[in-house]
Amino acid sequence: MKRFALFIFLILTICSPTSVKAQLDSLVYSPESAKLNAEGKNELRATVDAMTFFRDNEYNSKHLIKGYTLPGVWLSPSVSYQPLTNLKFETGVFMLHFWGASNYPNANYANLESAEAQHTTKAFHCVPIIRANLQLTPQVNIVLGTLYGKSAHGLAEPLYNDEMNISGDPETGVQVLYNPHWMDLDAWVNWQDFIFRDDKRQERFCFGLSTRFKPSRRKARFQWHIPLQLLMQHTGGEVNTEAQDRSIKTWLNAAAGVGFNVPLRTQCPVSLGAEFLGTYFSQQCGTALPFDKGYGFLAQAHAQVWRVRLTAGYWASHQYIPILGSTLYSSMSTSTKGITLNNPRMFLLRAEYAQYLGKGFSWGVRFGFDLHHESGVWNANDHTYTHRSMTNDFDAGIYLRLTPSFLIKKFKTDQTK
């Protein structure tokens, strides 16, 4: 682990600058935009979207989550056609491969940590890519099929685990995007599991809403925003009478707060910012989880210097359970059933570096350090309560993103009347 960190440090030290942009989310995780270009009308294009990655999670909080490593690549070649200035179709395939893996769970990859090696496929995990993108106005897009998802939603860490950018399936369903100058709105339904009659699995889908209000004037130096986010996971179904578990389960996560960003007048591009979030958890239906309600508070400060983004934050919660967020923010263990944490606290540090290499190519690295502290740990299996514990966790990852696009043919517009 120390050699891996030293290797990344040396790369950062000797690399030469080619861009002043620096955000792992925008450059590496979610570089594509849903906005359609009028110049793309009648174009037939081939795109090769891929990411190679190596992420190591050294978790010492064994009572909460076990450590693991994700080495691999995902590849998503596709062909797109834009018959109109405001309509685009895309089809392809998404393939995920972990180095050294020969069997893959045959399921929707929404939480890789809980996936079991049963009903497997060989060589790689594969799902289709089919998307229709209709741009009703310059500010409104309706997407059917494969969504612009994952980090593109802009969800906070307690609601969404950034690791799903490398291990999660593409989201599928319906999505509405609304982006006037004063706000960004993203509403979607991600249909994760479809069932047939007498299916042994349950129907499962997730509804999400991510809004970011921007009251500041466009040219104002001090930019502040108000995030409002919601995730609701539903599991059920009426036609799967053979399922072992037919109980309805509905869970909700929400977050709201305020944040700001201020660019400094320096020769080197520098900006400072902070964000304060309150989060909420609710078990709307079912008794699968140990808590019915919970909450948490996250305060973060960040500094963007050249291509480097540094973040420091503090998290405090009570009976909060993330639906799609990292277990590090949870009051419930995923490594051992029956273990819960009493009032967990976490001090977190993040360091990110992202570099634009050229059109269709970018790379980045990320380091994370977390210091956990809770009032106590309750084990329902043997009815024991351990007072006060403190642990630390570390993660590091390196990512290379490729999104080259090739024009196959531009069809001529029919001028006949």
Regions found by a protein language model. Name each.
Residues 26, 34-58, 87-89:
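Transmembrane beta-strand segments of Gram-negative outer membrane beta-barrel proteins
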Residues 87-135, 157-158:
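Surface-exposed loop and membrane-interface regions of Gram-negative outer-membrane beta-barrel proteins
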Residues 141-212:
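Surface-exposed coil loops of outer-membrane beta-barrel proteins
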Residues 18-22:
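Sec/Tat signal peptide C-region and signal peptidase I cleavage site
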Residues 4-14:
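Sec-dependent N-terminal signal peptides
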Residues 76-97, 177-188, 273-275:
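Surface-exposed extracellular loop regions of Gram-negative outer-membrane beta-barrel proteins
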Residues 51-74, 104-105, 117-118, 382-385:
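Surface-exposed strand-loop-strand hairpins of Gram-negative outer-membrane beta-barrel proteins
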Residues 3-4, 24-26, 49-51, 72, ...:
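Exposed, low-structure sequence patches enriched in small/polar residues
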